[in-house]
Amino acid sequence: MLPSNFNNCQVSLDDALKELQELKSSNELDFEIRIVREITDREECLDMVLGTNLPQGSELENGKLVDLVVGIKKNETTDTIKETEYELYLQKLNDKNLTDLNLLTSPVFGTSNVNQLIENQELITYIKSENPLNYKFLFSEAQGIIYGVDEKNNVIKLLDISIKTVREKESGLHTFDFVKFDSSNYLLLTYSGTDGNYYLSAFELLPENEVGDEIVLIVFELQNDNNVHFGGKILQEEDNLFLCLGDLNSPGNSAKFDSPWGKVMYFNKNDLFETPITSHDDPRINYIVYGLRNPWSCFEHNDKLVIPDVGSIHWEEVNILSNYLNAEEPVFLGWPWLESYFDANYKNTPVDEQTKQNQLENAVFPQYTYPHANDYCAIIGGTELFSSEKWDGYFFIGDFCTGTIWAINVEKDSDIVVLEKNIVPFSITTINDSGNGTLLVGTTAGSILEIILP
């Protein structure tokens, strides 16, 4: 039975954990324990249990989830909570024999050098080196502007749609790419519009690096006044365009097919230029993945689809899908029922119980994961390096809060840290290929960094 004093700061986090572990041992129970931080102004409640997700006196049973809500100061978490959290996360991984998947234990490989190429811009959302405009690279800002950068690192404005979008949390301009249609080159981009819609649009590239008028290829209605969990990454394969979308902060979207959110889809690009897609049930849409929460990026790697999915409050995921175009049914990646390998404690019912069970039975789990511990918070993707023999077979992902960057080679079962935490003084937002064997990294502070790998 859940102790009656697990509320109103009557018991410390350490004592609560000891008591729960004793209950597990003495009663041969197997239930999950998590720590949930909650900001409090009460000094006496720091590192103390404010409450739980269960009514006091609840029966503790196998499979139950116990969330210990612990008081913290705003923007300050004590070492006690950090250490205890990480120990709990390690125990969860150990219980499922998953410790090898934890990226926080990856060894450090050499020392990378960091050069600042661009500074004093707005939040960077995407960077691309390969382009038909002869720029060294281009980058986008969340506020709705795309720039080209020449060989002297001069920044030249290419497109400004800031009147159509707004930077608010994760809303704004998300990504861009280039596509050829009827012998003309087009700039593609995704953005959340101020009119309550989400757009995949094209702009023809004209002489003198001018761009034509907007051609809407896809428009999806946004739900409510949402400003997070868009995704928006564009991929290409022959005549197909792929779009990776988040759940719009409505987890049920990811489990059902009455909206495009929380999914990866593809469609023939030629059809879009003739008639835009305006509904999630347009027959031209091919859904291939669902069960996503907030994929800031997705990318192809050695004929695989890599989807780093930002977790809720506990776990980050690296999903790697083989033969993703040949699956008979869309692949389910777990959300909202699972966060990584673990119960997400989602209680709403977007689908019936039988559908939920079928989804759980067929869920595909991430190949790598890491917990929200030791200041790590959100997974950022991602790229491979196409012009580097040394790093052939690897792809690169990072963590938003710490600036850590990992290199992963699935075939060699190798995951290593190539940029240690806290070297980059800003939160990183995107990791891309420079075309010269180095990484280009964007930040929330409007900087673009070149990472010269060891």
Language model segments and positions:
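Acidic, Gly/Ser/Thr-rich repeat motifs that build Ca2+-stabilized beta-propeller blades
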Residues: 81-251, 297-311, 375-412, 434-453
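Second-shell loop/turn segments in exported
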Residues: 1-10, 77-79, 108, 163-164, ...
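Short beta-strand-to-coil "C-cap" segments at the C-terminal boundary of structured domains/repeats
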Residues: 71-74, 205, 268-269, 321-322, ...
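Ligand-recognition elements built from short beta-strands and adjacent flexible loops
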Residues: 1-85
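Structured segments of extracytoplasmic/periplasmic soluble domains
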Residues: 19-27, 57, 71, 126, ...
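Beta-propeller domain segments
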Residues: 87-98, 132, 171-173, 247-416, ...
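Extracytoplasmic/secreted envelope proteins and their assembly/folding machinery
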Residues: 13-17, 231, 261
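Solvent-exposed coil/turn segments that connect beta secondary-structure elements
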Residues: 38, 57-59, 71-73, 142-144, ...
